[in-house]
């Protein structure tokens, strides 16, 4: 571009900026920082107290330091007991983990007092796996029971199944899902066996 064209393009922009600055200066009153300091409510000799410096180390009382050392030396079981005792002593309720966004829309409301009392009672964990144990067999139905046991015990022949039935109580199957354990129990009881799920 030519120098004259460049000066023409800059000219109107600079003119608009100057006009805008003049307009702002007319509308905004000038505030003097010194005048603000003189009008403040602080006394002249008093230093302004600011926030404590973040990089300055905080001094803790010896009692607090000793508590921290004692807690740090506890085992996990002792920490669990300490946590439980503190909750009881300070009457703090167990609170589940909150989602990151806070309350989830449509979530269940917080439990009321009767429900909270039910939570204090330890719930028995429902078992999902069982051991099927044959405890008794009717002498009349031994043949049917031996054949049925052969179906459920892997790698066993009729002679081994007969010895198993003659030396009761015996474990038929271990670590079986609840549905399968119930199925085995029903089948063995149908042919004259007495079965216990453990």
UniProtKB/Swiss-Prot annotation:
Annotated positions of the N6-succinyllysine modification: 150, 162, 178
Residues with PTM N6-acetyllysine: 125, 138, 142, 144, 150, 163, 173, 178, 185
Gene Ontology cellular component list: mitochondrial inner membrane; mitochondrial large ribosomal subunit; mitochondrial matrix
Biased composition (Low complexity): 106-115
Chain residue numbers at which the record places covalent cross-link Glycyl lysine isopeptide (Lys-Gly) (interchain with G-Cter in ubiquitin): 150
Alphabetically ordered keywords of this record: Acetylation, Isopeptide bond, Mitochondrion, Ribonucleoprotein, Ribosomal protein, Transit peptide, Ubl conjugation
A Pfam family hit: Ribosomal_L12_N
Main location (coarse class): mitochondrion
Region spans: Disordered: 106-126
Subcellular location: Mitochondrion matrix
Transit peptide (first-last residue): 1-36
Changes after translation: Two mature forms are produced by differential two-step proteolytic cleavage. Cleaved by the mitochondrial processing protease to produce the long mature form and subsequently by the mitochondrial intermediate protease to produce the short mature form. In the presence of CUL3, undergoes 'Lys-63'-linked ubiquitination at Lys-150 which results in proteasomal degradation.
Example GO molecular function: mRNA binding
GO biological process: mitochondrial transcription; positive regulation of DNA-templated transcription; translation
Family stated for the protein in its record: Belongs to the bacterial ribosomal protein bL12 family.
Oligomeric form and interacting partners: Component of the mitochondrial ribosome large subunit (39S) which comprises a 16S rRNA and about 50 distinct proteins. Interacts with NOA1.
Function comment: As a component of the mitochondrial large ribosomal subunit, plays a role in mitochondrial translation. When present in mitochondria as a free protein not associated with the ribosome, associates with mitochondrial RNA polymerase POLRMT to activate transcription. Required for POLRMT stability.
Name used for this protein in its record: Large ribosomal subunit protein bL12m
Organism field: Bos taurus (Bovine)
Primary gene name: MRPL12
């Amino acid at each position: 571009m030519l120098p004259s064209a460049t000066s023409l393009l800059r000219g109107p922009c600079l003119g608009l900026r100057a006009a805008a600055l003049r307009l702002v200066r007319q509308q905004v009153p000038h505030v003097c920082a010194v005048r603000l300091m003189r009008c403040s409510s602080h006394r002249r000799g008093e230093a302004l107290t600011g926030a404590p410096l973040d990089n300055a180390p905080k001094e803790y009382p010896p009692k607090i330091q000793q508590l921290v050392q004692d807690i740090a030396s506890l085992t996990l079981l002792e920490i669990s007991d300490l946590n439980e005792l503190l909750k009881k002593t300070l009457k703090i309720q167990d609170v589940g983990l909150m989602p990151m966004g806070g309350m989830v829309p449509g979530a269940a409301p917080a439990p009321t007092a009767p429900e909270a009392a039910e939570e204090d009672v330890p719930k028995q964990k429902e078992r999902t796996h069982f051991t099927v144990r044959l405890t008794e067999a009717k002498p009349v139905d031994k043949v049917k029971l031996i054949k049925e046991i052969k179906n459920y015990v892997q790698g066993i022949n009729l002679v081994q199944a007969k010895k198993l039935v003659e030396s009761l109580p015996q474990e038929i199957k271990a670590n079986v899902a609840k549905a399968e354990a119930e199925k085995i129990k029903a089948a063995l009881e149908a042919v004259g066996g007495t079965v216990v799920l453990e």
